[in-house]
């Protein structure tokens, strides 16, 4: 049984990797332990969020499926951080978890060149440092030129619920111990991480009337640029989430049972996600907090079960029931599924190239939680990139590597492969130095030309993106070139829309840059913009408001590209540089990087440190040439 590409694991990374591979013309096999769980959302019933929404839109722009599935399975859509700048706003959707999985599986089953088989991959076939295929638990051998491992939390997975430990990669499913051993035998450095999930509660036993209702946006925006926006808004049915809070009684119940918490007893060894702590960890670390938010999220459109966001736990079942019942609105709530923690093996992502191919084994790619990340979106992004790069390598083409100034996906992969991680890695807008250039709404105009080149975005959708980009550029040009003089009529106009007058000649771009200027005012200033759709107007306004900042950031990028090529002189005296911390100096001395590019890839070396180093290198060269 011969294939071009084999993907091991049918989670979010596996779905994107297998679809990309098959659509790029490769005979592809997806191996999954349970065929019905392909595309399953193991934890929260939501896609997107701050920075994660950026990833979903970038996946979409490159031709991935996550956004399209979310638009179809979504039951509530919101833009987070709406009052903040456009660079840090994030789209988030509640999804029908059952529907999401069905849609994902159907896409897999109906894609040409792609086969799905329910088996457990147990070992990799390696010959002379190159992957040749996969052996399964049913003693089948599948040959392939490229293999992508997207194993999620299944590598030597151990589930913890109070004092109880059991082997499993997800509750009710087996772990993959043999595959973990096979990866280790390849010489890959591996570690141990932990994640967790909360209890699911019978929705009919919750009193929503005493909770705060949290609805979706009145005019919901789809995730995918390929989804018809107007039709989506007309037909999309949304249901609310609810907010309640823990209280002192909740905290007392949890604290009095710390001695039974696996994360405190030493039962759990793996490090958990810093930014998604368990409720027992929150109570322990933030003892001054009188309460913590809990978001009650429906898992399906029918709302039969609710996910208690903010209450991830591995406490024993009896304690989970007590703490749930201590919360307002859940006094009579009944748990359907208990929360648990799970420990699993991961591969140090510094073992990877930027293509996500391993450095030690040719043709072997890794994507998702196996690389130390947490989150559906981070996994899907890696899966897509691995699928694309595996395909390009088979075609003898150049690898596809996104830069940090091109995409959040570029930031994600660069962080992983250059810095590694000791805890589950989550994407944040703060990780992106060039976030003004990487807004959610610009993902399609930034990246869809790549997706089109790879054959993952069709001509019709690509032409639509080009038309959008042309309209935005034309609007931005009009703002730049429309000049107003400070005469009485113009000042009176500004005053009439609640704006202060001007003393000097001014461009429309300068006027819309004012904080108080919105789309309605821009339409009065430039009436010809009435021909544009609302989402185009939003982008034109953003272009106008941030033009000078974007220009400055673009100049910084060009400057950085130029001096990253600069060589660091041999035996350079790093300790003579003022402005560098002791930690940075020690790392530079330890690694002794040959260029600024190499120095920038050392964990903990900041862009500011690179700039300082560049200045001192120029001084050193100048002194040597005297």
Curated annotation (Swiss-Prot):
NAD(+) binds at residues 272-286. One of its GO terms (cellular component) is cytosol. It comes from Sulfurimonas denitrificans (strain ATCC 33889 / DSM 1251) (Thiomicrospira denitrificans (strain ATCC 33889 / DSM 1251)). InterPro entries: FAD/NAD-bd_sf (IPR036188), GIDA_C_N (IPR049312), MnmG (IPR004416), MnmG-rel (IPR002218), MnmG-rel_CS (IPR020595), MnmG_C (IPR026904), MnmG_C_subdom (IPR047001), MnmG_C_subdom_sf (IPR044920). FAD binds at residues 9-14. Disulfide bonds: none annotated. NAD-binding protein involved in the addition of a carboxymethylaminomethyl (cmnm) group at the wobble position (U34) of certain tRNAs, forming tRNA-cmnm(5)s(2)U34. This is tRNA uridine 5-carboxymethylaminomethyl modification enzyme MnmG.
């Amino acid at each position: 049984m011969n294939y071009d590409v084999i993907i091991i694991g049918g989670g979010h990374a596996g779905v994107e990797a297998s679809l990309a591979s098959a659509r790029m013309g490769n005979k592809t096999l997806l191996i999954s332990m349970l065929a019905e769980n392909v595309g399953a959302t193991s934890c929260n019933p939501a896609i997107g969020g701050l920075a994660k929404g950026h990833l979903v839109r970038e996946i979409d722009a490159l031709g991935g499926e996550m956004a399209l599935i979310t638009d179809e399975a979504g039951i509530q859509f919101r833009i987070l951080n709406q009052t903040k700048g456009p660079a840090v706003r994030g789209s988030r959707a509640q999804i029908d978890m059952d529907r999401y999985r069905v849609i994902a599986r159907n896409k897999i089953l109906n894609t040409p060149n792609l086969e799905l088989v329910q088996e457990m991959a147990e070992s990799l076939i390696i010959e002379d440092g190159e992957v040749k295929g996969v052996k399964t638990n049913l003693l089948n051998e599948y040959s392939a030129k490229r293999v992508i491992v997207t194993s999620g939390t299944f590598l030597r997975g151990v589930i913890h619920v109070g004092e109880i430990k059991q082997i499993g990669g997800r509750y009710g499913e087996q772990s993959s111990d043999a595959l973990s051993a096979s990866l280790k035998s390849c010489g890959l450095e591996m570690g141990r991480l932990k994640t967790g999930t909360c209890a699911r509660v019978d929705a009919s036993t919750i009193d929503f009337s005493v909770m705060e209702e949290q609805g979706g946006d009145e005019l919901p925006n789809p995730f995918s640029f390929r989804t018809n926006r107007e039709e989506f808004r007309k037909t999309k049915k949304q249901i609310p989430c609810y907010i309640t809070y823990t209280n002192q009684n909740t905290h007392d119940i949890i604290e009095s049972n710390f001695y039974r918490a696996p994360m405190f007893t030493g039962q759990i060894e793996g490090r958990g996600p810093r930014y998604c702590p368990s409720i027992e960890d929150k109570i322990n670390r933030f003892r001054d907090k009188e309460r913590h938010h809990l978001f009650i999220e429906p898992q399906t459109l029918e709302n039969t079960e609710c996910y208690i966001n903010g209450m991830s736990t591995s406490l024993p079942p009896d304690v989970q029931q007590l703490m749930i019942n201590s919360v307002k609105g859940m006094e009579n709530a009944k748990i359907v599924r208990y929360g648990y923690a799970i420990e699993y093996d991961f591969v140090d992502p510094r073992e990877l190239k930027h293509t996500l191919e391993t450095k030690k084994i040719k043709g072997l790619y890794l994507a998702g939680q196996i690389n130390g990340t947490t989150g559906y979106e981070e996994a899907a992004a890696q899966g897509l990139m691995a699928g694309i790069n595996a395909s390009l390598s088979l075609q003898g083409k150049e690898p596809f590597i996104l830069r940090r100034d091109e995409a959040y996906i570029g930031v994600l992969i660069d962080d992983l492969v250059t810095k590694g991680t000791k805890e589950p890695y989550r994407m944040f807008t703060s990780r992106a130095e060039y976030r003004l250039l990487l807004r959610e709404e610009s993902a399609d105009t930034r990246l869809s030309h790549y997706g089109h080149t790879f054959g993952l975005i069709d001509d019709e959708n690509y032409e639509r993106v080009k038309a959008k980009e042309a309209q935005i550029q034309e609007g931005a040009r009009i703002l730049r070139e429309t000049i107003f003089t400070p005469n009485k009529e113009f000042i009176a106009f500004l005053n009439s829309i609640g704006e202060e007058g001007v003393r000097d000649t001014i461009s429309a771009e300068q006027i819309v840059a004012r904080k108080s200027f919105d789309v309605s005012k821009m339409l009065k200033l430039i009436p010809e913009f009435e021909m544009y759709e609302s989402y185009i107007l939003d982008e034109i306004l953003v272009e106008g408001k941030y033009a000078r900042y974007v220009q400055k950031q673009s100049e910084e990028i060009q400057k950085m590209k130029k001096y990253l090529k600069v060589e660091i002189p041999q035996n350079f005296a790093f300790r003579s540089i003022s402005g560098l911390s002791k930690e940075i100096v020690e790392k530079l001395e330890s690694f002794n990087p040959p260029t600024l590019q190499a120095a920038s890839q050392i964990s903990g070396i900041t862009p500011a440190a690179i700039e300082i180093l560049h200045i001192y290198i120029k001084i050193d060269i100048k002194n040597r040439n005297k």
